[in-house]
Amino acid sequence: MLNHFNFKLKRDVTIIVPGEAFVSNDRVISTILGSCVSVVLYDGVRRLIGVNHYVLVKSDSVVDVLQKGRYGVYAIPMLIDAMIENGASKSNLKAKLFGGANFMAKGTIRVGVENSEFAVNSLTKYGIPVVAQDFDQSKSRKIFVFPENFKVVVEYPDGAKIF
């Protein structure tokens, strides 16, 4: 995790890397995604946001406790728990999902598709509505999550969108 002043935004930003998550009520949270997925959770009543960044759905071997955030099977429930520990109510949570790019040729390993499908299915299982998603393109993206309005700005190599 890196905290820095973003001159373009004119404010402090917390950047998370693969395997990390962060919860805040006042800081912009950012990360860069390819085939990885970030789940953005927010509680509009308690004014709280949380973002994770996972690499794969699961590991085929035993996972060290410090590496659990790299795998969706752990990263998603850990983010939900962190939101609740910081004052969110599970019944207020909503999700926005990003990443899941596929850079490989069709018919090969599709990590991005697996990651994005897992996120959607997991949040459905937890009863958290997905209100926006940006998946399955063959390009990277950088996201900025804003705590004051829960908007996510997604920057691509060739443009940007707001979710």
UniProtKB/Swiss-Prot annotation:
Encoding gene per record: cheD
Catalysed reaction, written as an equation: L-glutaminyl-[protein] + H2O = L-glutamyl-[protein] + NH4(+)
PANTHER family per UniProt: CHEMORECEPTOR GLUTAMINE DEAMIDASE CHED-RELATED (PTHR35147:SF2)
Protein name from the UniProt record: Probable chemoreceptor glutamine deamidase CheD
Xref: Pfam families: CheD
Keywords attached to this entry: Chemotaxis, Hydrolase
InterPro entries, per the entry: CheD-like_sf, Chemorcpt_Glu_NH3ase_CheD, Cytotoxic_necrot_fac-like_cat
Family listed: Belongs to the CheD family.
EC number(s) recorded for this UniProt protein: 3.5.1.44
Function: Probably deamidates glutamine residues to glutamate on methyl-accepting chemotaxis receptors (MCPs), playing an important role in chemotaxis.
Single GO MF annotation: protein-glutamine glutaminase activity
GO BP annotations, alphabetical order: chemotaxis
Organism whose genome encodes this protein: Borrelia turicatae (strain 91E135)
Hydrolase in keyword set: yes
Keyword Electron transport: no
